[in-house]
Amino acid sequence: VNVDLHCHSTASDGALAPAVLVARAFEKGVRVLSLTDHDTLEGLDEAREAAHSLGMQLVNGVELSCTWGGATIHVLGYGFDQNAAPLVAAIAQLHDGRWLRSEEISRKLSLKGMPGALEGARAIQQELGDSGNAPARPHFADWMVREGFVKDRAEAFRKWLGAGKLGDVKQHWPTLEDTVETLRASGAWVSLAHPWHYDFTRSKRRKLIADYIGAGGHAIEVVNGHQPAEQVGSLAILAREFGLLVSAGSDFHGPGGWSEIGEYRPVPEDLPLLWGRFKHDPIIATV
């Protein structure tokens, strides 16, 4: 696949530095790439420089955390002005919120007999490349494995860090509506990340998409890495029903993970592709 609109670097919870990630994407045949780190724009300049040297198109990207219906939701933004005041302010708030969240996760783990989690997760993060951002849940998970509290990252998420568990701290995120508004005001195209990852009933997922459209969302991510084909089919049906654009990406975090950069299931051919719009500036008032 020569377009990948979802991947992560060491600027957030990925394992590869932005320039290394871009080089890997190029080797895998990707020619249009968006780096979508969690709640930070920190890796974009390095990624853009690397992409330009290889003749690739680097689309500004970010994956913002927000809340809806008591759950943490992720929203992808593309093609925005990196210096737009609304986005810069939102990123600063999220940066602070992520540190508060990491401190809270560490406190909770300490009460369960796992002291030193923040320092340990930070050490894991710094081994990959220090970003100055708070360690994320994968860093905590890797620390738990290293300390022998769990056997692997999957167990860490299943028992301690996943949705609804002790480490699922979300009160530091803005609302879905505010997040979409921030992205729109910054000139972004907006896509709802991996709608099937949320543990929702069918009716709640439909309500999420309806509210997301009401907030001004443009697209949904119908393909996320190697997610099951039946999920892609169900999301495609929703995209058709709601008249949405669609995006797709590997959600690559690092070598040896569940996905590879530039690899994901095919997008159903009849769906309108978000990346087909990137040549045109979104008209914020009317799109």
Residue ranges and their predicted role:
Residues 81, 92-103, 134:
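Short, amphipathic alpha-helical segments
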Residues 88-97, 127-130, 166-167:
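Flexible, glycine/proline-enriched loop segments at strand-loop-helix junctions
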Residues 34:
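A short beta-strand/loop micro-motif in the catalytic core of glycosyltransferases
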Residues 130-195:
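Conserved acidic, metal-coordinating active-site core of Asp-based
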Residues 96-128:
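Conserved phosphoryl-transfer catalytic core
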